[in-house]
C-alpha cells in the first residue's frame, strides 16, 4: 500500500488530507494516477506540482511507486 498525502489546495481538490492506495506490485506513477478521480489526477499532474517520495523531492517522470512508499504532492507556493 502506498500513502498519498495532499498539501495546500491539492487537499481541497482531493477532499481528504491523505489516502492509501493498495498496490499489488511496483506501479508507475502514471498508472497510479489513473486509479484516482480524474479531477484529482489532473491537479496532481500540474506543471508546478512537486512530489516528495519518502521525504525526498523527486521527479515524476519515470517514478515507480512501491509498497510502503509515501508520496507527498506539493502545490506551488506563493507569497510576498
Summary of predicted features, one role per range:
Residues 1-79:
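Ubiquitin-like/PB1-type beta-grasp interaction modules and other compact soluble beta-rich domains
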Amino acid at each position: 500500500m502506498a500513502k498519498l498525502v495532499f498539501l495546500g489546495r491539492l487537499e481541497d481538490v482531493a477532499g481528504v488530507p491523505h489516502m492509501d492506495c493498495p498496490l499489488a506490485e511496483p506501479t508507475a506513477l502514471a498508472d497510479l494516477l489513473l486509479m484516482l478521480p480524474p479531477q484529482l489526477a489532473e491537479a496532481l499532474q500540474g506543471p508546478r506540482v512537486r512530489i516528495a517520495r519518502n521525504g525526498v523531492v523527486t521527479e515524476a517522470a519515470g517514478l515507480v511507486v512501491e509498497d510502503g512508499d509515501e508520496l507527498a504532492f506539493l502545490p506551488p507556493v506563493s507569497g510576498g
